[in-house]
UniProtKB/Swiss-Prot annotation:
NCBIfam families given in the database record: argC_other
Cellular localisation: Cytoplasm
Cited Pfam families: Semialdhyde_dh, Semialdhyde_dhC_1
Protein name: N-acetyl-gamma-glutamyl-phosphate reductase
Gene Ontology CC: cytoplasm
EC number assigned by the record: 1.2.1.38
Database matches in SUPFAM superfamilies: Glyceraldehyde-3-phosphate dehydrogenase-like, C-terminal domain (SSF55347), NAD(P)-binding Rossmann-fold domains (SSF51735)
Iron found in the keyword field: no
Gene Ontology MF, one: N-acetyl-gamma-glutamyl-phosphate reductase activity
Organism expressing this protein natively: Agrobacterium fabrum (strain C58 / ATCC 33970) (Agrobacterium tumefaciens (strain C58))
GO term, biological process aspect, one: L-arginine biosynthetic process
Positions of the catalytic residues: 117
Gene that this polypeptide is encoded by: argC
Catalysis: reaction(s): N-acetyl-L-glutamate 5-semialdehyde + phosphate + NADP(+) = N-acetyl-L-glutamyl 5-phosphate + NADPH + H(+)
Length: 310
């Protein structure tokens, strides 16, 4: 049977990416709303309730409104790409590789919260170390990251690409979230299984798609006996058998002198690296992904596939 999919917010950055990925598929029927009618609540509600899966690509408040529109309809399932439900206990977190059984949780869920781009990289690095006992309680985790400017949506895309605008951004790279209260911090804390919120310093570069997330660590403050090798082994074991998330071999990492944030642009995979000083005192964990791929639209399609396979 052909599954009916509705993308609420299909004309935004994430929605367009999802629609592009699904275009031409014969196993699904894409329900669509004209851009001129995107604020037509009655039309949206009808489409939301007639879909097998509705994918919400909306701001937080609009996502909550959409969820309320299907409250009495158990036949429709929801994937939400906003931050509204990412730490909600009744929603499955849509990072399928996060744990061995996470894919099954997504498969059987009615409500799935798509992960944020930065948290996907951060949690991908941190959670295996918490699960293995390498990263102790109370460790002051810091997360540094750079994203392609498409992560800021249509407004930032226009600001970066059209220098004639009054609000144009001329910087090639800029920090933001300077109050250290970024909306992704709760998500990193909860799903990273941290007992202390991380210090998160995000930035944006003048490139459309791509992302580097770094988690630097002091080996002396980790579990006794921790080395670059034991961290790499923990990550490798955690993601064994996974196709989308891969851990780069240490021998290969030792030959790398730089990492290109755009390497995985246009792809839905994520690479994890472990680097460090020769003596192993300082360790740097790195996640490489596309902010619109595994960090957004690619993950949404992956979650949709899991839900359709139930």
């Amino acid at each position: 049977m052909t599954a009916k999919i509705f993308i609420d917010g299909e004309h935004g950055t994430t929605g367009l990416q999802i629609r592009t990925r699904l275009a031409g598929r014969r196993d699904i029927e894409l329900l669509s709303i004209p851009e001129t009618e995107r604020r037509n609540a009655a039309m949206r509600e009808d489409l939301l309730n007639n879909a097998d899966i509705s994918i919400l690509c909306l701001p937080d408040d609009a996502s909550k409104e959409a969820v309320s529109m299907v409250a009495g309809n158990n036949n429709v399932r929801i994937i939400d790409t906003s931050t509204a439900y990412r730490v909600h206990q009744d929603w499955a977190y849509g990072f399928a590789e996060m744990d061995r059984d996470q894919g099954e949780k997504v498969r059987s869920a009615r409500f799935v919260a798509n992960p944020g781009c930065y948290p996907t990289g951060a949690i991908g690095l941190i959670r295996p170390l918490r699960a293995s006992g390498i990263l102790p309680d109370g460790y002051p985790v810091s997360v540094n990251a750079v994203s392609g400017y498409t992560g800021g949506g249509k407004q930032m895309i226009a600001q970066m690409e059209d220098q004639s605008r009054d609000d144009a951004i001329s910087a090639n790279n800029f920090l933001y979230g300077l109050t250290l209260k970024h909306k992704h911090v709760p998500e990193m804390t909860i799903h990273g299984q941290l007992d202390r919120a991380p210090l998160f310093a995000p930035s944006v570069g003048r490139f459309p798609q791509g992302m580097i997330v770094q988690v630097p660590l002091f080996a002396a403050d980790l579990a006794e006996g921790t080395t670059i090798e034991t961290i790499h082994a923990a990550l490798t074991a955690h993601y064994a058998g996974q196709d989308i998330v891969s851990v780069v071999p240490l021998a290969e990492s030792k030959g790398i002198s730089r990492i290109d944030a755009e390497e995985l642009a246009g792809k839905d995979t994520m690479k994890l690296f472990v680097f460090g000083t020769p003596g192993g005192e300082h360790i740097n964990l790195v996640a490489l992904l596309d902010n619109l791929g595994k960090g957004a639209s690619g993950a949404a399609v992956q979650n949709m596939e899991l839900m359709l396979s139930a």
